[in-house]
Swiss-Prot record:
The keyword Transmembrane does not apply. The modification Phosphoserine is found at S26, S396. GO terms for cellular component: intermediate filament; nuclear envelope; nuclear lamina; nuclear matrix; nucleoplasm. Residues 28-64 are annotated as: Coil 1A. This is Lamin-B2.L. It comes from the Eukaryota. GO terms for biological process: heterochromatin formation; nuclear envelope organization; nuclear migration; nuclear pore localization; protein localization to nuclear envelope. GO terms for molecular function: structural constituent of cytoskeleton. Residues 19-30, 443-473, 612-623 have a biased composition (Polar residues). Residues 621-623 form a propeptide. Its main location: nucleus. The gene is lmnb2.L. InterPro entries: IF_conserved (IPR018039), IF_rod_dom (IPR039008), Lamin_tail_dom (IPR001322), Lamin_tail_dom_sf (IPR036415). Residues 75-211 are annotated as: Coil 1B.
Amino acid sequence: MATTTPSRSTRSSMQSPARGTSTPLSPTRISRLQEKEELRHLNDRLAVYIDRVRALELENDRLMVKISEKEEVTTREVSGIKNLYESELADARKVLDETARERARLQIELGKFRSDLDELNKNYKKKDADLSTAQGRIKDLEALFHRSEAELGTALGEKRSLEAEVADLRAQLSKTEDAHRVAKKQLEKETLMRVDFENRMQSLQEEMDFRKNIYEEESRETRKRHERRIVEVDRGHHYDYESKLAQALDELRKQHDEQVKMYKEELEQTYQAKLDNIKRSSDHNDKAANTALEELTERRMRIETLGYQLSGLQKQANAAEERIRELEELLSSDRDKYRKLLDSKEREMAEMRDQMQQQLNEYQELLDVKLALDLEINAYRKLLEGEEERLKLSPSPESRVTVSRATSSSSSATRTSRSKRRRVEEEYEEGGASTGFGAGHSLGSSRITASEGSSRTITSGQSSTTRFHLSQQASATGSISIEEIDLEGKYVHLKNNSDKDQSLGNWRLKRKIGEEEEIVYKFTPKYVLKAGQSVKIYSADAGVAHSPPSILVWKNQSSWGTGSNIRTYLVNTEEEEVAVRTVTKSVLRNVEEEEDEDADFGEEDLFHQQGDPRTTSRGCSVM
């Protein structure tokens, strides 16, 4: 560490090399030149650090904008896909319930057809036995016909007894058929109710499992957007298969109903004709025998026809069952395919998470570097303050001049160095940008005061040092706050601090600078500031591209303006001020100094030999 203290000296001892080029450099001059080079080197390092921090902050803003845009896109896509998936799943569940109900009904009808077939077989066997018995009796009657007329009376009596038995049997058969029909209907109703309750229970269970899986696996919902296309394609095939199957089953059902009805009518007619023939056979034995033989032949042919038809119906029923099994296998294969697609989408989501984590790690490393730079700059400033304290010197604007590179060849360079120092202090003490001025937000009001600065003007006879003070005051009555304003008039930064979107349609952002005319920026009618997001409104000369909703450009205004008293406020559609930020620049003092003291700030830039007894109150320390 080197300590230098400027002092007042005579003109003969402070002459520049240009006045005495033949005089060799003294050790004091060499030491001062070395200290000057060392300070320039340190100033270069500080400038590099500041540029690096600004670049990191710009990169940080860019990354935050990218992350917010990605989060908005992801949220929008996930919500849309979730709604589509829920609707598609509800439709699929409804179709499955209808299919299960239709299958149960078809199974009931198939069981009914099988029971009708068994009943027809039993009736056929019974009628065949009755036919054999009738043939035996016909032979007996033919034998008895030749015996005597007395036996004819006996036969007539037997005939009457048989007719009574047939009537009793018919009545019993009718009652039994009615009871059987009622029982079958009740069984069908109970079966349908049981199947319906089972389907409803299964649907509720599936819905409960689905809601549980939805909340546990929200990350998988993004894969549904690929599934939507597949479902739309397969849905058409599925609907075609269902419509064709339903049409075929309806046709089979109608054919079965018509055939069964026809069979019943024909059997009843045949049975009635047989009874009539038996009655007439007692009166006309010869005619009855021939009629019985013809009826037997017709019945045999009819039974064979019915057998063929029943076998055809059984084949159709088997084909329908085979088709149902094929459709179930197709549905199972589709489910397996969709499951594989879901697994692949899960892997893609895992890769995306890894990439996001890697980006976050890189971002954290950048933040660590920025923090290290901030600490180094703060240490630099504390060393300067400690050296001033050690030498019992009050902090003066001249002590800050050494932070930035400057020469005494012109007064403009000195003013530039002090201006740079002021901006550095505003950036690292206030947390704002290099040219911006702002701080945190609150619903009340907050006051933030920047570091003092100074400017120096050198004339032929004297110099003046002007110190100024920057302060700002911000307040907000709602969720929108004015987060930052640029002192050079390039932009104004607004932020939505709530968790809800805020419509800024037709709101106006106004700026008043001293006594100048007020300028007004009006938002578009449909502009909305998202929750937690921010927007910067740049002037036309800022050189920034228009990129809504985070970056807006005021094309009709070249600059927001600069001045010593800047008031920026946001007004809603009801002319109420919802956010205000005021920046004030005030002059603290103006000190006049003599010409010979200005000479000390000449070519050697406040450097002198250490330990000079002519040390004044000015001094600085350099790391």
